[in-house]
């Protein structure tokens, strides 16, 4: 039976892709972008992918645009992976790409958008989450001509950006879905782990102030911290129940992460959260908002009790905590629509214009 299901998926997923509008990729260049630090870039490139076509109502307002934002070290391409893609964008799914206009940007410093590894290295402007959200807004409004969003959602860092969209542009969207995030300053263990990642690179003599010829060993040390930052104890025990399997599991992840990351980019990506703090602005968020976290998320552990209290300040907010099951994946549960799709469906229903 399992083999049959596997074969069905192998043939069904490509067939489903043929039934959907082809993804479109592009770049939008913002001229003379001024960062929160006061630094400027003559040309800031933002890469993006779109699925579907925009549709307007009788007043000319867009009614089907959806913005989905990725996590730290990621890109918009991560939402084209099978579990997310077919779970949300496929025919008959909640965000069917034949019905919605889906926008998947690469944030500043990520993917194919402007980033330190393009050549500026540590001379790249010290961007923040505020800069990233402002640039996303410029892409959406000026680059793509979108004047309203049906839904703003994001995973991890993208979830944090979703909170920011809610108070920076409160009338711009119908609904908000932050996944795997908290609406408070990054402190405690979370900030300590980020500092460990940054220090592991910058304290390595091979980093050379960012002017290395090959990736410094400090990147590998940083990757160890990244891996355990997003770990899932239950699932990892199931996947690696012996010493040999555990070591092979770790070695594989270290190799994949180090081959995908750049040391300077990683420093910027994790430090961009340094002044993130939506807490003073939560009452400004007026669109219906469902904040979804999972009980096995080591980045946003529910025992802190933060969302239990802060969600009370969001006028139309609701906190959903997914219980630990055999299907949750710790912090990575944010990318499994099968776990939280029922709540997205409810959010879309109650926020219908």
PLM-predicted stretches and their roles:
Residues 49-118:
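N-terminal cap/lid subdomain of alpha/beta-hydrolase-fold enzymes
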Residues 130-151, 168:
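Conserved acidic catalytic loop of the alpha/beta-hydrolase fold
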Residues 147-190:
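Conserved hydrolase catalytic core segment
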Residues 172-256:
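Alpha/beta-hydrolase-fold enzymes
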Residues 265-281:
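Active-site nucleophile elbow and catalytic-triad environment of alpha/beta-hydrolase enzymes
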Residues 285, 291-293:
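Short beta-strand/loop motif that positions the catalytic acidic residue
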Residues 298-306:
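Conserved alpha/beta-hydrolase "acid-adjacent" motif
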Residues 314-353:
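Catalytic active-site module of serine/aspartate enzymes centered on a nucleophile-bearing elbow/loop
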């Amino acid at each position: 039976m399992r083999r049959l299901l596997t074969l069905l998926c192998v043939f069904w997923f490509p067939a489903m892709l043929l039934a959907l509008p082809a993804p479109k990729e592009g770049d939008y260049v913002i001229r003379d972008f001024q960062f929160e630090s006061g630094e400027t870039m003559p040309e800031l490139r933002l890469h993006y992918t779109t699925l579907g076509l925009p549709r307007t109502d009788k007043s000319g307002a867009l009614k089907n645009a959806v913005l989905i934002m990725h996590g730290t070290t990621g890109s918009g391409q991560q939402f084209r992976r099978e579990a997310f893609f077919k779970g949300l964008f496929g025919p008959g799914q909640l965000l069917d790409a034949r019905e919605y206009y889906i926008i998947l940007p690469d944030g500043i410093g990520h993917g194919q958008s402007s980033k330190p590894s393009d050549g500026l290295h540590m001379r790249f402007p010290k961007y923040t989450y505020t800069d990233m959200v402002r640039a996303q807004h410029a892409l959406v409004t000026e680059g793509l001509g979108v004047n309203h969003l049906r839904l703003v959602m994001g995973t991890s860092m993208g979830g944090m950006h979703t909170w920011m969209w809610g108070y920076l542009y409160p009338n711009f969207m119908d609904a908000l879905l932050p996944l795997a995030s908290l609406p408070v300053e990054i402190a405690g263990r979370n900030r300590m782990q980020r500092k460990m990642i940054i220090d592991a690179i910058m304290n390595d003599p091979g980093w050379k102030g960012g002017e290395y010829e090959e990736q410094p060993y400090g990147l590998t040390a940083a990757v160890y911290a990244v891996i355990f930052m997003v770990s899932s104890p239950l699932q990892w025990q199931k996947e690696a129940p012996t010493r040999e399997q555990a070591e092979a599991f770790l070695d594989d992840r270290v190799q994949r992460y180090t081959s995908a990351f750049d040391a300077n980019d990683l420093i910027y990506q994790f430090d961009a959260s340094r002044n993130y703090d939506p807490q003073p602005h939560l009452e400004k968020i007026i669109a219906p908002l469902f904040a979804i976290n999972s009980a096995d998320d080591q980045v946003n552990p529910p025992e802190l009790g933060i969302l239990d209290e802060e969600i009370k300040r969001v006028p139309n907010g609701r906190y959903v905590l997914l219980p630990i099951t055999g299907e949750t994946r710790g912090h990575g549960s944010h990318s499994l629509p099968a776990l939280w799709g029922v709540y997205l469906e409810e959010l879309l229903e109650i926020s219908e214009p």
